[in-house]
């Protein structure tokens, strides 16, 4: 069961009544986090803005555009008219009794306490007209699955910065809130033009997870072998999902079943040491619902979902091809994708891995790369190196 901090008293859904007293307590909590000056300023600015928001009501929002759908809900970019803030509003349609609905809203209040540079900011949650609304900070770069579509593949140096943010985000959720994410995948890693990388859509409400259990099927392809087998799973399961996501973003396609040497050559434009096609007996090359790869060589039908799940549980884990990626990156991913969760690296071990140490030391203009890749204007703030 998910451990939750007791919900704040008072059913004022957005917790505004106690907002003023909370700000000082929050600032105290921020001091405990190891933040640099810029991160601290940005979090404080977010919390100050949030104070102006007041109680969230359906009438106060104006729809701007749809940002995406999935995970049982639709996300819109909205304007919150009273405060003038741009937010992302996720709407989840649920046919549930009022008591359950109230419990979900209550459990979501924990999100008010999730304040970290690696976690998407939360404005509040409320219920109206058969839908639960979760209002979050708008991340103008979208999710990494959207970025991947534009980029084709994401460079190793960029994935180094992504790995740091995901590990730090998962560590924060675990250490400060005793929760695991449960749904790490490229579409739940959001980025923005300031170069920030944040996790969203983590399992904070046990009741919401239960109520949405039937709509979770599409996510299973990122689940760890132990989770697919229904055995006990922990934050180690999130590490598998992160490893799988990194391989996908590095090679430009969902990595199960693995590409053979012919497909790798088409991907990277040169002969690459891949597996000799072990899966020759099974003429399938794509995960369910995945478009045909743009390389054109792939005329095989997609794997059925049960075949895919069987593959994850029974076949060797995916890995990065040799000769294209650094050995530290390969080793990092291999340690995330060990099938036995007890042998898989944990968050502490990953944080001191050579790949992470190198990535931390590297000067990478993440914001510049993102903006040029997806065609966003970079904000002209002093947060970027001159001449970028």
From Swiss-Prot:
Sorted UniProt keywords: ATP-binding, Cytoplasm, Cytoskeleton, Kinase, Nucleotide-binding, Nucleus, Phosphoprotein, Serine/threonine-protein kinase, Transferase, Tyrosine-protein kinase
Question: Where are the stretches annotated Disordered?
Answer: 1-20, 275-299
Record PTM Phosphoserine, positions in chain: 211, 215
Gene3D superfamilies this protein is in? Phosphorylase Kinase, domain 1 (3.30.200.20), Transferase(Phosphotransferase) domain 1 (1.10.510.10)
Catalytic reactions on record: L-seryl-[protein] + ATP = O-phospho-L-seryl-[protein] + ADP + H(+); L-threonyl-[protein] + ATP = O-phospho-L-threonyl-[protein] + ADP + H(+); L-tyrosyl-[protein] + ATP = O-phospho-L-tyrosyl-[protein] + ADP + H(+)
Q: Where is the active site?
A: 183 (proton acceptor)
Post-translational modification note: MAPKK is itself dependent on Ser/Thr phosphorylation for activity catalyzed by MAP kinase kinase kinases (RAF or MEKK1).
What EC class is this? transferase
Is the keyword Nucleotide-binding assigned to this protein? yes
- Give binding positions for ATP: 67-75, 90
- GO cellular component terms attached to this protein's record: centrosome; early endosome; focal adhesion; late endosome; mitochondrion; nucleus
Function (record text): Dual specificity protein kinase which acts as an essential component of the MAP kinase signal transduction pathway. Binding of extracellular ligands such as growth factors, cytokines and hormones to their cell-surface receptors activates RAS and this initiates RAF1 activation. RAF1 then further activates the dual-specificity protein kinases MAP2K1/MEK1 and MAP2K2/MEK2.
This chain's protein is named Dual specificity mitogen-activated protein kinase kinase 1
Species of origin reads Serinus canaria
